[in-house]
From Swiss-Prot:
Main location: secreted
Proregion positions: 23-39
Keyword Metal-binding belongs to the record: no
Protein name listed in UniProt: Brevinin-2CG1
């Protein structure tokens, strides 16, 4: 009876250790995924900022040209 309890205790202990190792690996994998999403989001934000600044530059040059032609100072 004692040997049976001892072996069950060892199995429980080993199962607990393997479960905690699996959880650590899963958490490490999830952290990598979050980093990738942040990088993608950062790249998309940079592209968006670049597009907005380019559009502002084009709009400003068009307004300058239009005001020059309206004032007949070109």
């Amino acid at each position: 009876m004692f040997t049976m309890k001892k072996s069950m205790l060892v199995l429980f202990f080993l199962g607990t250790i393997s479960l905690s190792l699996c959880e650590e690996e899963r958490n490490a994998d999830e952290d990598d995924g979050e980093m990738t999403e942040e990088v993608k989001r950062g790249i998309l934000d940079k592209l968006k900022e670049f597009g907005i600044s380019a559009a502002r530059g084009v709009a400003q040059s068009l307004l300058n040209t239009a005001s020059c032609k309206l004032a007949k100072t070109c």
